[in-house]
UniProtKB/Swiss-Prot annotation:
EC number in record: 2.7.1.11
Activity regulation information from UniProt: Allosterically activated by ADP and other diphosphonucleosides, and allosterically inhibited by phosphoenolpyruvate.
Binding site for ADP: R21, A22, V23, V24, R25, R154, G185, A186, E187, R211, K213, L214, H215
Protein name per the record: ATP-dependent 6-phosphofructokinase
InterPro entries assigned: ATP_PFK (IPR022953), ATP_PFK_prok-type (IPR012003), PFKA_ATP_prok (IPR012828), Phosphofructokinase_CS (IPR015912), Phosphofructokinase_dom (IPR000023), PKF_sf (IPR035966)
Active site, per annotation: D127 (proton acceptor)
Assembly and interaction partners: Homotetramer.
Secreted listed as a keyword: no
Amino acids binding ATP: G11, R72, C73, G102, D103, G104, S105
A GO cellular component entry from the record: 6-phosphofructokinase complex
């Protein structure tokens, strides 16, 4: 393995830069040339590629986003688009590729592997929705960003005696809502894995109000429904003044936590090791405190994990 390409794809997540840095420095340490592919699979198809050196990744470990930028690419989903990408890799003599991203990026990595290009996928998504790995790069930072905002909303919610609904990211996986809801002391946590029970939410809010609670917090994953509409329904049913806040893309930004920097560094270095060992079609993950790798397709076939125990604990502690 002489030349390794690295790209970031799909939604960005804090810690991607730390992973890029690990790929570049680990690769150079092992005598490889590292090529940075800009704007994901789109940049691969259009040959937006340049060689990276040690200076290319100086002072980026603490930065959010991705210096390689990212994009979604419908063209790569087509056979013609993938043939263009393969031709670019052959012309530039890129022997293997590290792909950093979420589910869609992993699908692309699998396609590259099927074309005969050794490819290693590294999980970078704030949603934590790749079931084969305990954590994905960016999830911890997103949790802490949301938790900080919850603390601020709690202050004003208490002052006004309101209920506040906080909508966070998570279309199919409610991990951000679940763990920030527990850590933030939310009265209700609404996630796709469980669904929405408006009557139960209203009952809990009224129960709290009747015993003198000054405020209530509800954390809602975006995959369940809209916070604004839910707020109107709750206010009508309970008479409790309710405000809704949609956090949106603020969750994707910011300096990564120590956990995400370390996780990204370990995963990026493992990806390079695998390619040097001529092992492609692999997904890097973490179980317990151990970095591991497995077949990409097998990784994609593992369903999102749902932490029922934590959800039940959150219910108990929210009484």
């Amino acid at each position: 393995m002489k030349t390794i390409g690295v790209l970031t794809s799909g939604g960005d997540s804090p810690g991607m830069n730390a992973a890029i840095r690990a790929v570049v420095r680990s690769g150079i340490y092992n005598g490889c040339k590292i090529m940075g592919i800009k704007q994901g699979y789109s940049g691969l198809i259009n040959a937006k590629i340049e060689e990276m050196n040690l200076s290319s990744v100086a002072d980026i470990i603490h930065r959010g986003g991705t210096i390689l930028r990212t994009a979604r690419c419908e063209e790569f989903r087509t056979e013609e688009g993938r043939k263009k990408a393969l031709n670019v890799l052959k012309v530039l003599k890129i022997d293997g590729v590290v792909v950093i991203g979420g589910d869609g990026s992993f699908q692309g990595a699998k396609k590259l592997s099927e074309l005969g290009i050794p490819t290693v996928a590294v999980p970078g998504t704030i949603d934590n929705d790749l079931g084969y790995s305990d954590y994905t790069i960016g999830f911890d930072t997103a949790m802490n960003t949301v938790l900080d905002a919850i603390s601020k909303i709690r202050d004003t919610s208490t002052s006004h005696g309101r209920a506040n609904i906080i909508e966070v990211m998570g279309r199919h996986c409610g991990d951000i809502a679940l763990y920030t809801g527990l850590a933030g002391g939310a009265e209700s946590i609404i996630i796709p894995e469980v669904g929405l029970d408006i009557d139960e939410i209203c009952r809990k809010l009224l129960q709290g109000k009747n015993r003198g609670k000054l405020h209530s917090l509800i954390v809602l994953a975006e995959g369940v429904g809209g916070a604004i509409d839910l707020g109107k329904i709750i206010e009508e049913k309970t008479g409790i003044e309710t405000r809704s806040t949609v956090f949106g893309h603020i969750q994707r930004g910011g300096s990564p936590t120590a956990f995400d920097r370390i996780l990204a560094s370990k995963m990026g270095a493992r990806a390079v090791d695998l390619l040097i060992e001529e092992k492609g079609n692999r997904a890097v993950g973490i179980k317990g405190n151990q970095i591991f790798d497995m077949d990409i397709e097998e990784a994609l076939n593992i369903e999102n994990k749902f932490d029922q125990e934590t959800f039940e604990l959150a219910k108990i502690l929210s009484i």
